[in-house]
Amino acid sequence: MFAATRLSRLRHDTSRILSHWILPLGWLALLTGMFWVGDRSDYHRLFYILLAAPTLLYVILQPRLLRPLTGSPLFIAFLAFSSYMMLSLSWSTPENSTGSLLKRPLYIALLFFCAAILALEAPLRLKTATWLAALGAVISAAATLLRYYWDANPLRLTGYGALYNPLLSAHVYGAFTALWLAYWMQSRPILAPLPLISLALLGGLLIATGSRTPLVGLTAALMWLVLAGDRKKALIALALALAGALLGYILYPEVITQRGASFRPEIWADALRQISEHPWLGHGYDHPMRIVLSNGMLLADPHNIELGVLFAGGIIGLLLWVAIYALAFGFSWKNRKSPAVLLASTWLVFGLAAGLTEGNAFLPRPKEHWFLIWIPMALLYALWIQQRFAASRRGEDIAAP
C-alpha cells in the first residue's frame, strides 16, 4: 500500500515537472530555436529532447488523457490524412527511407499532444511561452537587420544559421508578423508601442528578404482579422499595410519589377500535368517531382503546398487535407471572440495563404513549414481540447447534487 502511494506520488510529481517546466521550455525552444541554433540538425535534436520525448513520457504517465487527446475531430482528421499518406508509400518511390517517413506523423502528433497538455495543465505558461517566442522573433529580427546593413549586404537578406536563405527567413519571421498583427488587434490602445514597433521591425526584415510569399500570407491574415476581429483596427492595419507596400516598392522596386511571377504559372501548369497522370490516388507520399522550366532550370517541388498534397495523395488526399482545415476554421469562426483562438487562427490563415505560392513539405520533420501549418494547427487543437474539458467539467458540476 505504502509502495503504491509512493509510486503514485512520484508519477504525479514527474508529470507536474513535465507539464509546468520541461514542456513550456520545449515549446519555447521549438518556436525560437531557428533563431539561435546554427544547424538544422541541432534544431531537430532540440525538438526530440525538449518536446517529443517529454510529451511521450507524460502520456505514458497519464494514460487517461490519451482517449480525449485522440478523440478530437481535428486530431481524427489529421490521423486519417496522415494514415492515407503513409498508405500511399506502397505505390510511391520515396526519396527518403520508409522508416524516416513513418516517424513524421508521430512527431506532429506529439506536437499536438504537447500543446494540449500545456493548455490543460499550464495554460498561462503556454500563453507566456508563445508571447516570449514572439518577442524573441522581434529581437532576432532587429539583430538580423543590424547585421545585414552593417555588412556589405547582398541584394536580398538571406538570414543566418538555420535560416540560411530568404524563403526560410520569410516563412518563420512572416509567421511571427501575423502573430504580432493579432496581438496588436487585441491591444487596447490603438497606438500600442510594442506591437507597432514589432510589426515595423518584422515588416522591414520581410521586405529585405525580397520574398513576396509572406506578403500574400499577411494580406490574407489581415482579411481574416477584418472578418473575425476588430474591424476598425483591421481596416487601419490594412491601410498601413498598403502604405508599407508602397514604401517597400519605392525602396525595393526590384522585389516587384525584376522577378515578375517567378515562373509560378509555368511551374503550376507542369505540376498539374503530372497530377493528371494519377488524379485520384496521386503518385504517393515523397514521390519525387521534377519540373523543367523553359530556361532549363530543374525544380523539385510545385511551389504550392496544396499542389504538393494533390501530387502525392491525389484528389482523395486533397479532400482529407481540406477536411483538416475545414474543421480548424469552423472551430475558429465559432469561437472567434476568444483572443487565443483569434491569435492561432490568424497564424493559420497566414500559413495557408503563404503556402499557396511556396513550399511542398506538408508532412515534414520540424522545420520552417511547421510555422506555416502544424504549429498554429496544434494551438487550435489545444484550445479545442481545453474547451471540451471545460464543458465536460461544467456538465459534471451541473449534474452534481
Swiss-Prot record:
Protein location: Cell inner membrane
Domain of life: Bacteria
Cell inner membrane among keywords: yes
UniProt entry tagged with the keyword Metal-binding: no
Sorted UniProt keywords: Cell inner membrane, Cell membrane, Glycosyltransferase, Lipopolysaccharide biosynthesis, Membrane, Transferase, Transmembrane, Transmembrane helix
Entries under InterPro entries matching the protein: O-antigen_ligase-rel_domated (IPR007016), WaaL-like (IPR051533)
First-listed, main subcellular location of the protein, grouped into a coarse class: membrane
Region span, WZY-C: 258-319
Protein's job: Transferase involved in the biosynthesis of the lipopolysaccharide (LPS). Catalyzes the transfer of a polymerized O-antigen molecule from its polyprenyl diphosphate membrane anchor to a terminal sugar of the lipid A-core oligosaccharide, finalizing the biosynthesis of the lipopolysaccharide. Required for the attachment of both A-band and B-band O-antigens, two forms of O-antigen produced by P.aeruginosa, onto the lipid A-core receptors. Important for cell wall integrity and motility of the bacteria.
Other facts: Was originally reported to have ATPase activity, required for ligation as an energy source. However, it was shown later that ligation occurs without ATP and magnesium ions, and that WaaL cannot catalyze ATP hydrolysis in vitro.
Family designation: Belongs to the O-antigen ligase family.
Name the UniProt record assigns to this protein: O-antigen ligase
Upper taxonomic lineage: Bacteria, Pseudomonadati, Pseudomonadota, Gammaproteobacteria, Pseudomonadales
